[in-house]
């Protein structure tokens, strides 16, 4: 497994484009949630219903995980409210893309 983020990711434009194409095909209104994500909803106090598909289209990719040259997950940052952004890991290892985990961060 190889993880590209930050500077490593910025040097791999084709990988970013491929990850963006995968994200564009995801129906965020019906996105499945993993058990790991569901266990932490209360703890992390995040409501995915506040994140519209329009906000998802403007999301920033900050991490891509590869396994045998296949994208297995993409990390994105998306606007949550005026003070915070939601960081999400979307997994593509199964047939249906799923939210693996997410958390809130203060805007910088």
What residue spans do the PLM features occupy?
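Ribonuclease/tRNase effector modules and their secretory precursors
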Residues: 1-108
């Amino acid at each position: 497994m190889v993880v590209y983020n930050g500077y490593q990711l910025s040097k791999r434009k084709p990988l970013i484009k491929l990850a963006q194409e995968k994200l564009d095909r995801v129906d965020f209104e019906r996105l499945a949630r993993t058990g790991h994500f569901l266990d932490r909803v209360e703890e992390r106090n995040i409501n995915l219903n506040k994140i519209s598909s329009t906000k998802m289209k403007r999301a920033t990719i900050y991490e891509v995980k590869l396994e045998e040259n296949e994208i297995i997950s993409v990390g994105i940052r998306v606007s949550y409210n005026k003070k915070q952004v939601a960081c999400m890991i979307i997994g593509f290892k199964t047939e249906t893309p799923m939210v693996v985990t997410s958390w809130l961060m203060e805007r910088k």
